[in-house]
Amino acid sequence: MPMKMGWRWYGEGNDPVSLSDIKQIPGVTSIVWALHDKMPGEIWEVDEIQKVADQIHAYGFDMDVVESVNVHDDIKIGLPTRDKYIENYKQCIRNLSKFGVKVICYNFMPVFDWTRTDLFHPVGDGSTALFYEKDKIKDDYKAMAEYIMSFTEKYNMTFPGWEPARMAKLDELFKPYAPVTKEKLWENLKYFLEALMPTCHECGIKMAIHQDDPPWDIFGLPRLLVDAQSIDRFLSMVDDPYNCLTLCTGSLNANPNNNCAEIVRKHCDRIAFGHIRNIHHFPNGDFSEAAHRDCCGETGIIEVLRAYHDCGFEGYIRPDHGRQLWEEGPGNCRPGYGKYDRALGVQYMLGVWDLLDRLDEEKKKG
């Protein structure tokens, strides 16, 4: 079975890009979805899943990949209450398996999910993109949260990992993490996964961890999945075929020393889901997200796709963050999740894949 192309969709009334729009993009067969109104630790009930399933299936898409079932902070911190939330997570897995879900993407980042300093940064050609300015990331996490929340308040748009209910109690979230060292966070991640693996086997669902974004410590909080060595540790720590990766080229390549193609070749059999995102680096350590075409950034998109192709990858891939093009901007577009640049990215990736298929066919013919 060949690689399957997905598209992240935030749901009816929550995403300016409709399923009807997505249906018109050649090659997209899978909707990457979630119940975005659920808080970490809550059970995803069958009737809630059914409602979204009906919407997705009406357009002929599969719903094999969920992004994300977020992990409760008590699990990450290692509090005594974590077992209750792990049991809830297991029930989510069981309920999702009733709808044919094959992969759950998640992350284990403390407090914050992704972090950027500008959501609509001009990139010089009239488009805008997500931008990270290193000098703006100091120790003032409240200022960063206020910036993100300003978009929520002005445009009624929420962002995964930056939910208003969580941001309203930032100090409460930070305090329990004070004694959590990097090693303790590793221990808590292992505990979580070892508890889940029997349920994953029972239900046929792979847990696929997303790398930390950006891949370095911020606001004094430890980050785990940041480079090839930490990925090696993660996969060997719970050496189980259902303990997998969501390999995000954009998160990893925010550090230009990370070679994503090499990681794909080494761990292709443990990659369940791939995010393809291009990054343009600046000499001072800042970075901007870029178009998917190889020459628009320094991620090495062609080599990453070649690595997946050479490995016979049969999992799921989606275009990750693109630019905001033409009329897209605050109020009518989710940062990084516009319609046009991601659609262009899909066609670019499938074009590279088709060429690699053709070259293989010609080799076989001699």
Q: Where is each model-derived feature located?
A:
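Glycine-rich, proline-tolerant flexible connector loops at the mouths of alpha/beta enzymes
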Residues: 34-50, 219
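Acidic/aromatic-lined carbohydrate-recognition and catalytic surfaces
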Residues: 65-99, 103-123, 127, 134-145
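Catalytic domains of carbohydrate-active enzymes, especially glycoside hydrolases
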Residues: 11-36, 55-59, 95-104
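Histidine-acidic metal/acid-base catalytic patches
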Residues: 1-6, 11-13, 54-57, 74-78, ...
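Conserved beta-strand edge residues that scaffold enzyme active sites
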Residues: 36-37, 70, 110-111, 214, ...
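Extended, charge-rich helix/loop segments that form flexible
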Residues: 111-188
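An N-terminal, globular interaction/scaffold subdomain
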Residues: 45-68, 85
